[in-house]
């Protein structure tokens, strides 16, 4: 009986500690971004500062802390990631995410803006 109670206590402690440390809920891709939103992170693996973009914002020139510094992202919307000079663009679809976007394509280190919808919606670059 003592061994059984000890095992229950140990397992319960591990379970509680994993919740406290975020071990069971630490992966934001399990939840994803809400519909119509994109989460941008300043560090890889969904860490660091987080910027929440909502498609109702329309065209968005990234804030200084994220311009040329999108290390990871989770998308709940179809959006276009844009670099104006030289012109580059990447179509991102709802449900897409990258833990280390800057290293994967190196585009996160060059990104200037977000536009809702498809990259084909871009007519010309802003000057």
Curated annotation (Swiss-Prot):
GO biological process terms held by the UniProt record: spore germination; sporulation resulting in formation of a cellular spore
A GO CC annotation given for this chain: extracellular region
Subcellular location: Secreted
UniProt entry tagged with the keyword Signal: yes
Keywords annotated in UniProt: Glycoprotein, Secreted, Signal, Sporulation
Signal peptide: 1-25
Chief location of this protein within or outside the cell: secreted
List of glycosylated residues: 54, 118
Family as reported in the entry's similarity comment: Belongs to the Dictyostelium gerABC family.
Name of this protein: Spore germination protein 3
Lineage: Eukaryota, Amoebozoa, Evosea, Eumycetozoa, Dictyostelia
